[in-house]
Amino acid sequence: MNTKRTLVFLLALSLFMTTVVSAQKSDKLPPIKYQEVTLKNGLRVIMHEDHSTPIVAVNVWYHVGSKNEVAGRTGFAHLFEHMMFQGSKNYDNDYFTPLQEAGGTLNGSTNPDRTNYWEVVPSNFLELALFMEADRMGGLLEAMTMEKLNNQRDVVKNERRQNYDNQPYGTAGEKAVALLYPKEHPYHWTTIGSLDDLTAASMDDVKAFFRQYYVPNNASLVIAGDFDPKEAQKLVEKHFGSIAKGAAITRPNVPTPKLDKEIRVQYEDNVQLPRLYMSWHTVPRFDKDDAALNVLGLVLSAGRGSRLQSNLVYGKQIAQDASAFAPAQEIAGRFQITSTARPGKTLEEIEKELNAEIERIKKEPPTADEIARALNQIESSFIFSMQSVGGFGGKSDQLNSYATFVGKPDYFQTDLERFRRVTPADVSRVANTYLTDKRLVMSFVPRPKGKEMPKTNAAANQQASVSKKEKTKVDSTKLPKPTANPKFVQPNIEKTKLSNGLEVWLVKQSELPIVTMNMVFKTGTTADPRGLSGLAATTSALLDDGTKTRSAVDIANEVQSIGAQLSTLSDDDYSGVRMLTLTKHLDKALDIYADVIQNAEFPETEVETYRNRTLVSLKQRRDNANIVANIVYNRVLYGDAHPYGVTINEASAKAMKRDDLKKYYSTYYRPNNAVLIVVGDADLKTLTPKLEAKFKDWKPSEVSPMSLPDAPTRDKAMIYVVDKPGAAQSVITIGQIGVERNSPDYFPLQVMNSILGSSFTSRINMNLREDKGYTYGARSGFSFRHGAGPFSASAGVQTAVTKESVMEFLKELRGIRGEIPVTPAELEYNKQSLIRSLPRSFETVDQIAGQLANSVIYNLPETYFNDFAVRVNAVTLEDVNRVANKYLTPDKLAIVIVGDRKTIEPGLKQIEGLGSSIVYLDAEGNPIR
């Protein structure tokens, strides 16, 4: 498996790091200017211009979620999220098809309070996105059929299996809300709802729910990006104006839930380690105490220096993890603390320490520094999130969120100010008010070996009939045509070289006051010595755990003091150190950044702490079928003698010494083996002297080029099974060794795989998900590396159709080779999709830095991105057929399946040519004898 260790400081409010610099309360956020109109039918339209990238986002929110359902009819809001992609009156076909051809990306989501849908497309396809959204708002029911409904019910059941039943601790959330909220409360059930309710629902039930809530007066539309508001308003009137207004919406009005005593429950799960959950009722989102409760969560658990981390995780080392957060919703909120026990430790020990920390913060308010640290990180997160116009959490999504829940799209500054008003006394007060003995204490413990796993609703429904989705011919000439294509030009790269040989690439982007620095080292995990797999990743992970002048806590606190993000990673072909900061803190950020890169010390205590935590993580990864499938698949393909076949394991983790880390670091972390990529609000002329001052003492040294052994060859296809008793799904991975990144066949392979399995509308996904209903999603892809990386096609499928799913995968792999010939229309569709999607990957500073990092790692031509469209357009049908037959060989495939052997084995044995010689492996890929 590809070993990675990324220390990413998450932007989510509940996970902000602690800092030490006082928040600058006078600072204002960059303004998000917008125009707003309301149509006669009640649709609220919000428009925000951002011409930095030639893309536009369309974002629609419906003020309906699972809380608008009633007992016995749960899951409707989430089901409609799926149904809205199945075709409507004027486009009765898969919703993704025209938008992905346009180079767009799209998605939707449902939570208890709202349902949202979004598209991000090249700016000349704005009318297409508006037409599609309007047609499903006004014409979904006219195209709804029982076949579509049954198909999407199957997809939802697969989603349940994949995201709940087949995940470690996956049912904790639904169990918690069922205990916290009474049966009559609309938060008593989760968004996915009851599968029994969905199965029992009639077409009339489903249509009635849609007519009530999916109406323009219960929706808001945001358009953000590169467009003309006057023209956009005309298009909105054209496509949405005739949709009928719905009846007035009645919002749920229920009493605030309360617990009158402590509730204690314990559940068994297929997990390695026990986990404790504590939950309390609090307040709704935007309540006067909401901000203080969020800050309480940050003080308790956000970052290495936080109270729970420093005590339970790094101090006493009784917990593998600990988190505290306040997930407030529209009509209620809660506070939750979660912690997983280390091996040999008990949940009783965990609970005792958690209780002590709760009592301490009640009696001892957090320091002013603790409060300020949280506020600085919050401020940064507001600005960092303004980079994207679309997607989840982008500007269009935020404008819609504020419009829906507070009635003011421009609530950004006001929202920040409510956090800035939080005092230490406020945090102590809310802890005393809400974290009482009237709480839910829920534990998940490992199921005893040999004990049968109880059947869930989803598992019990494994034999449900699978509905084939009906196919409808659509006249695509009725779709709006795009305006002229916007011209994409790759960003201008300024280059210089420091006195020690370090290359510096800079792309100036001044739309927002942020800068990212990405130091790319041209060596990664392929340099791991035999017997020390994981060395590169461990070296990377420990870079910021201590330098000659700073401890791990010092580094964390200083980074957080400026609201920055520092992360490290190691991949097959490279290692990297990234710092994202506000421009006003660039000098301080650079000081920390340069120190971590040049002066890592790998303190013995930190090495041992990391080793112990890694050994626990290695034990935990057996719980996750997807991780197991990845590890085993790569080992089956490459064996133990090739670096692509091995990952960190118990033996290598125990064998790794501090001297090994220092040797790897001193060998490969050299300026002549690196390129520093800087993107954002920075000037090369001003920055270069600062870089020279910080890096001048960093000395170059000879770095030998990496050489890879030849990958092993396969002489026949084989099925490999890893038994996971009681698994709710079978995770299937099928493939073979692929091709290196610098192959002349790179572009034909990209086009071929786009047709086969890299997008929602690909052959594999449309077959296994949309046509058969076997899975929540199926995909394929090449992992392009310096050496020949793996090709894989994969999906988590219903256990009952494991054999059938394998056969459909094989059918599609044979089909792309010629049994189901690629058509000229398929070829053109996928080429245009690839070409038109390129500008989206240059929107944020980190996206730009990531694209340039690929140029560094694989020595791509300077004009690579400008030439991208020409290279893709040059791919012919003959090219696609040639590479499919050259690189996909069905008679030599490795087929790895992680699932319930007892259930799936009889069917697998029936597969002609494969079923007679199944190999059985453990979770590390070792043969079971």
Where are these regions (language model features)?
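Bacterial N-terminal signal peptides that target proteins for export
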Residues: 1-9
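Bacterial N-terminal signal peptides
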Residues: 8-18
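Proteolytic maturation boundary segments
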Residues: 20-44, 228-268, 279, 310, ...
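M16 family metallopeptidases and their MPP-like homologs
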Residues: 48, 53-69, 75-79, 93-139, ...
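A common structural junction motif
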Residues: 134-144, 239-247, 355-366, 595-602, ...
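Non-catalytic, conformational "gating/processing" segments within enzyme and secreted inhibitor domains
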Residues: 146, 153, 207-239, 439, ...
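Alpha-helical scaffold elements lining the catalytic groove of polysaccharide deacetylases
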Residues: 197-202, 206, 653-657, 661, ...
